[in-house]
Amino acid sequence: MAKIVVALGGNALGKSPQEQLELVKNTAKSLVGLITKGHEIVISHGNGPQVGSINLGLNYAAEHNQGPAFPFAECGAMSQAYIGYQLQESLQNELHSIGMNKQVVTLVTQVEVDENDPAFNNPSKPIGLFYNKEEAEQIQKEKGFIFVEDAGRGYRRVVPSPQPISIIELESIKTLIKNDTLVIAAGGGGIPVIREQHDGFKGIDAVIDKDKTSALLGANIQCDQLIILTAIDYVYINFNTENQQPLKTTNVDELKRYIDENQFAKGSMLPKIEAAISFIENNPKGSVLITSLNELDAALEGKVGTVIKK
């Protein structure tokens, strides 16, 4: 039996609550399949599109005197509940359909970051909707948001993405796992908080990369494998070119060389690769699987996906 952290990509979860729910239902079947095979899993998820949409909607309401403005940390908490609820419901229904009595819990999770992290001066995490260049330039002019081109898919707003230091609710996660509970935690990389005097915490405007927090979680609970589910079936080098090549198996040294060659897009594939390297360096016997949400079953059979080992 293996202990596995499964990290679901926010971009792979669809563009609307309805689309997300359908995708989550299908994913639940694959995740429950892991459980029926005897594996112990913990689930994390991204929230880039979702938290951006929540923040955009609330800001629009505030600008039109229809409600208060909400800080980004609170928007992150809302996205954890929204995505976690749909995952939780789908998993509960799937478990019930096969007669398995197992509790599923979504845990609102805070993650400590350093307020002096250089990421706060260099926003890099894409969030929210995709725009064409003209739309992005107009919004940037009106609101002062920073936009970047995102892996050939359009322009998106970017926000700071500091490194995760510690998971505040880690001991609660461990307790739930010990009590045979299926845990959904660290959604969106966790709600970013900074440590204040007397060990208090305060939310800060940022979005932590969910794969980096998932790698930290995996190391902290000593899991055997980290599965990163995204929108593409393999990790590629020379991505979106005539020489595009999938990586079926690779290792840490090879990936570091590809990073030096700028093979992985900042804000999309690069943090996934950095998370994979971090996980394996902290857990040399572990492995990482990166593939698409829709190909999880095939990937678990070794038919698709990128496998990374030491």
From Swiss-Prot:
Q: Which residues form a coiled coil?
A: none
- Class of this enzyme: transferase
Any one GO CC term of this protein is: cytosol
| GO molecular function annotations of the record | ATP binding; carbamate kinase activity
Q: What is its EC number?
A: 2.7.2.2
State the CDD domains in the record: AAK_CK
Give the highest taxon in the source lineage.
Bacteria
Query: Where does the record place it?
Result: Cytoplasm
Gene Ontology biological-process entries: arginine deiminase pathway
Key words, A-Z: Arginine metabolism, ATP-binding, Cytoplasm, Kinase, Nucleotide-binding, Transferase
- Mention any Pfam family matching this sequence: AA_kinase
Q: Which reaction does it catalyse?
A: hydrogencarbonate + NH4(+) + ATP = carbamoyl phosphate + ADP + H2O + H(+)
Query: Which cysteine-cysteine pairs are annotated as disulfide bonds in the entry?
Result: none
In which pathway does this enzyme or protein participate? Metabolic intermediate metabolism; carbamoyl phosphate degradation; CO(2) and NH(3) from carbamoyl phosphate: step 1/1
Query: In which family does this protein belong, per the annotation?
Result: Belongs to the carbamate kinase family.
Listed name of the protein: Carbamate kinase 1
What is the scientific name of the source organism? Staphylococcus aureus (strain bovine RF122 / ET3-1)
